[in-house]
């Protein structure tokens, strides 16, 4: 057996004792010790052994390699820190022994320092540890190997004691004695292949001296080798198989507690892999919420003729909704002709005076100075009153045609009861301009003898210009509105009749009655509501 020390220290004289193995003599303060045996026996053609060790803390002088006598057959005791050399042969299985660096049958080199030993066969790394539990707590342990020893820093993070011949674990587990074929070591070149960068996880305790837990590669974590997620492996190729995936395919990652990955369903092929970007444990709970193409659900009723009819009816109901979304212009087919519209629109016919009376037109200006004198006659004659008139004019024509004026007489200054009139009689309203000239005198005859108490109604008196000879059956389109008077009547709870609210008038700028050359005549029309004629007070 030949040994090579990576970092030798100055040699020192060994103590007297039995025959030493043919190795370099001297205390090793820290480094790497490798050995090679060309003829390892029938069981192994070649043996490589590697030992990584470091000096204990608090030592000032180098330790010397000595041979130690076999201890007595007492219980497990503390492992001495002093230098010593012992032989592995003849020791009982339960007692700790010195570190053996030679073959299974040859003597071993005892190093009185904390060290790590590996036996390599092929590309598997096996770590050997001691079974003495007291040696973990007694004494001051040495720090990890110096940074110069790259193999120690990259393979382990803590020191281990030497193993016993029986291969007992450090926690008392006894998986059985290791066979001699497992105690091979690795050469320097092969050992460099086992070194990995970064931190390596601490080896499990009590697994028969193995750096990694001995599990069946097919059942690790309940997964098959193809579904085992990539992670930090043991030094050297691990027996776990890894499947090489194409560049465009993502690996199937699943939780350790969920067991083997189930077969993907047909409907989930369109969804992206949810476990690539988030926790795999939550994947079964929210992956169905991701948007994706939905597969049509087959309904057993669709196979029969009745199912096809229902489907067709559903499409007919949804077709108008789709056309509404596209736009109103697509509702009618392009071949259908549009509805013919009349040349002259009559939708606003009769609404012009209503719009003026209700003030829907924007006024162009106001004129002050108009007044109105109100009087009535009948069973009694109330006193005449004169009230101001608010006059507003409008610009509703592009030509120079005269625009009507709107006058409003407010009756609120007369009191809450308004202007009292008899139930049957005549109302006279005379309009004066700012020059106190009569613009128009309105005479309206009324009969509200049948009007119940607490009701109201109105009268609308119009003056039209109609062609001569058509007074009785004049066409409404041939009539021209000249004046309009709107009166509101109300009966009190006692049955007394009065004018209330306001009085509204429509008139023109100039008097059309003076134009004698026109072939038209004035026609008065008084209208009242009917069906119902009277309405109750609010």
Curated annotation (Swiss-Prot):
InterPro entries: Atos-like_C, Atos-like_cons_dom, ATOS_Transcription_Regulators
Region Disordered: start-end pairs: 1-114, 133-300
Biased segments, Pro residues type: 227-238
GO CC terms, sorted: nucleus
Biased composition (Low complexity): 1-18
Record keyword Disulfide bond present: no
UniProt keyword terms in alphabetical order: Nucleus, Phosphoprotein
Subcellular location: Nucleus
Phosphoserine PTM positions: 254-255
Region (Required for macropage invasion) location: 348-430
Any Pfam family the entry gives: Chromosome_seg
Sequence segments annotated as region (Transactivation domain 1 (TAD1)): 436-444
PANTHER family: ATOS HOMOLOG PROTEIN B, GH03947P
Family of this protein: Belongs to the ATOS family.
Free-text note regarding domains: The protein contains a transactivation domain (TAD) which may be required for transcriptional activation of a subset of target genes.
Task performed by this protein: Transcription regulator that may syncronize transcriptional and translational programs.
Protein name, entry field: Atos homolog protein B
Phylogenetic classification of the source organism: Eukaryota, Metazoa, Chordata, Craniata, Vertebrata
């Amino acid at each position: 057996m030949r040994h090579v020390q990576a970092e030798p220290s100055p040699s020192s004289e060994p103590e007297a004792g039995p025959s030493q193995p043919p190795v370099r003599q001297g205390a090793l303060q820290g480094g790497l010790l490798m050995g090679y045996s060309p003829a390892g026996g029938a069981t192994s053609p070649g043996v490589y052994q590697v030992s990584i060790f470091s000096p204990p803390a608090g030592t000032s002088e180098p330790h010397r390699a000595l041979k130690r006598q076999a201890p007595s057959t007492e219980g497990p005791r503390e492992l001495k820190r002093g230098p010593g050399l012992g032989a592995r042969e003849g020791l009982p299985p339960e007692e700790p022994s010195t570190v053996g660096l030679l073959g299974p049958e040859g003597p071993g080199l005892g190093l009185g320092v904390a060290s790590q030993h590996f036996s390599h066969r092929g590309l598997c790394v096996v770590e050997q540890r001691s079974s003495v539990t007291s040696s973990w707590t007694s004494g001051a342990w040495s720090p990890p190997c110096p940074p110069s020893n790259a193999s120690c820093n990259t393979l382990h993070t803590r020191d281990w004691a030497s193993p016993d011949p029986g291969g007992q674990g450090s926690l008392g587990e006894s998986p059985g004695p290791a066979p001699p074929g497992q105690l091979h070591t690795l050469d320097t070149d092969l050992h460099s292949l086992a070194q990995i960068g970064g931190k390596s996880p601490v080896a499990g305790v009590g697994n028969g001296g193995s750096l990694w837990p001995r599990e069946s590669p097919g059942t690790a974590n309940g997964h098959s080798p193809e579904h085992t997620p990539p992670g930090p492996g043991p030094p050297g190729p691990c027996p776990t198989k890894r499947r090489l995936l194409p560049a465009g395919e993502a690996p199937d990652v699943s939780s350790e507690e969920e067991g083997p990955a189930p077969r993907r369903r047909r409907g989930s092929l369109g969804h992206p892999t949810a476990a690539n970007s988030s926790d795999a444990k939550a994947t079964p709970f929210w992956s169905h919420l991701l948007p994706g193409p939905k597969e049509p659900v087959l309904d057993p009723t669709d196979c029969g003729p009745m199912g096809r009819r229902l489907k067709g009816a559903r499409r007919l109901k949804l077709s108008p909704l789709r056309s509404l979304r596209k736009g109103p212009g697509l509702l009618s087919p392009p071949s259908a002709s549009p509805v013919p519209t009349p040349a002259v629109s009559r939708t606003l016919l009769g609404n012009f005076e209503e719009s003026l009376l209700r003030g829907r037109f924007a006024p162009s200006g106001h004129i002050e100075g108009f007044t109105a004198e109100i009087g009535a006659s009948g069973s009694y004659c109330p006193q005449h009153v004169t009230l101001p008139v608010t006059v507003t004019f409008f610009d509703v024509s592009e030509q120079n045609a005269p625009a009507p004026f709107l006058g409003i007489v407010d009756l609120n200054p007369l009191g809450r009861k308004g202007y009292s009139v008899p139930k049957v009689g005549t109302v006279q309203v005379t309009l004066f301009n700012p020059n106190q000239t009569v613009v128009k005198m309105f005479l309206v005859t009324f009969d509200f003898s049948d009007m119940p108490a607490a009701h109201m109604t109105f009268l609308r008196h119009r003056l039209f210009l109609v062609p001569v000879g058509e007074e009785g059956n004049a066409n409404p389109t041939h009539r021209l509105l000249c004046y309009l008077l709107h009166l509101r009547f109300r009966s009190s709870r006692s049955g007394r009749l009065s004018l209330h609210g306001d009085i509204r008038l429509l008139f023109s700028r100039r008097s059309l009655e003076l134009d004698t050359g026109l072939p038209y005549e004035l026609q008065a029309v008084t209208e009242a509501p009917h069906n119902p004629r009277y309405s109750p007070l609010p």
